[in-house]
Amino acid sequence: MPKAKKSGRKKKYNYEQDRKKLKKKFIKKSNPRIENPQIRNAWDNRKSTARNLQDMGLAFDPNRALPLKKTSLFSGEIEPKPSTNIVIKPYVLNQLEEEASRPEKDTKTLSSDLIEYVQHMIREHGDNYKAMARDEKNYYQDTPKQIRRKVAEYKRCHPQQFDAFLESLG
């Protein structure tokens, strides 16, 4: 059976490559980018992932963190052993808890075209949604119910702007 053509070729050392740079590049690629800034700052590359998370007071394995109680055949109560995990970096845990407790603000906004459309409809027809459905600016032929939903969405997403608009109408 014939041999592959270039399989027996002698390997040559490439003097053009910077080995130090290649090693740094490999290490950087092998260590993933940690998105959370608190964990990233407290991370120690010399320690394992499990050890790093244990030092911060975080769980590496959720099955070990909250183990399921096994049902035993005998009724003798076995006391669970207390956890010996010592949190070396509690500030990370405190910062994560503080960040999680902050209320998340609603970032949903409507397009300027939709805001302009709703304002035109209210300016022309007030609360008459049937008349809005017959309006010539109703390009997408929205039903009265769809227009009512768009107005309600505008009220919910931009309450101050909606109130200011109603005051400007008089």
UniProtKB/Swiss-Prot annotation:
InterPro entries: Ribosome_biogenesis_Nop16
Any one GO CC term of the record: nucleolus
Superkingdom of origin: Eukaryota
Keyword match Cell wall biogenesis/degradation: no
Pfam families tied to this protein: Nop16
Annotated compartments: Nucleus, Nucleolus
Major subcellular site: nucleus
Key words of the record: Nucleus
GO biological process: ribosomal large subunit biogenesis
Entry annotated with the keyword Nucleus: yes
Similarity comment: Belongs to the NOP16 family.
PANTHER family membership: HSPC111 PROTEIN-RELATED, NUCLEOLAR PROTEIN 16
Protein name (database record): Nucleolar protein 16
Organism expressing this protein natively: Tetraodon nigroviridis
Species lineage: Eukaryota, Metazoa, Chordata, Craniata, Vertebrata
Name of the gene: nop16
